[in-house]
Amino acid sequence: MSGGKGKGGKGKGGKGKGGKASAAVEGAQQSHSSRAGLQFPVGRIKRYMKKSVQNKVRVGAKAAIYIAAVLEYLTAEVLELAGNAARDLKVKRITPRHLQLAIRGDEELDTLIQATIAYGGVMPHINKALLLKVEQHKKK
């Protein structure tokens, strides 16, 4: 018979039946986000999901992780494009205008995010018919 410390027979330390060696301090708590390798708060998203769904509907743990991962990816994508827009305009701070330029400049994000961005301005656009008239005047 083993040492009598549960199914694994090894107690709390070392490599138990789970297959992972305990490298961290014993009993150290790890957040859902750090376990999933995310920055967005998985626990908070799960709490919001549980609060907003109908009664007697269960929310799986992986659902909150998936939503957090999608939100983190979309946020990183928008911030990267907005940072590029800010850098093109030679400024160091991302403003709502840069967010507007980034979202409306990307076709997929434009269809996904159809909200009006406050202080975002409008997209620069000149009709091609007007451009042709200007070019014809220059040729004369």
UniProtKB/Swiss-Prot annotation:
GO CC annotations, alphabetized: euchromatin; nucleosome; nucleus
Modification comment: Acetylated once deposited into chromatin.
Database matches in SMART domains: H2A
N6-acetyllysine: modified positions: 5, 10, 12
Alphabetic keyword roster: Acetylation, Activator, Chromatin regulator, Chromosome, DNA-binding, Nucleosome core, Nucleus, Transcription, Transcription regulation
Lineage: superkingdom: Eukaryota
Listed Basic residues bias regions: 7-18
Region (Disordered): 1-38
Protein's job: Variant histone H2A which can replace H2A in some nucleosomes. Nucleosomes wrap and compact DNA into chromatin, limiting DNA accessibility to the cellular machineries which require DNA as a template. Histones thereby play a central role in transcription regulation, DNA repair, DNA replication and chromosomal stability. DNA accessibility is regulated via a complex set of post-translational modifications of histones, also called histone code, and nucleosome remodeling.
Quaternary structure (record): The nucleosome is a histone octamer containing two molecules each of H2A, H2B, H3 and H4 assembled in one H3-H4 heterotetramer and two H2A-H2B heterodimers. The octamer wraps approximately 147 bp of DNA. H2A or its variant H2A.Z forms a heterodimer with H2B. H2A.Z associates with the VPS72/SWC2 subunit of the SWR1 chromatin remodeling complex. Also interacts with RBP1/DNA-directed RNA polymerase II largest subunit.
PANTHER family from the UniProt entry: HISTONE H2A (PTHR23430)
Protein's UniProt name: Histone H2A.Z
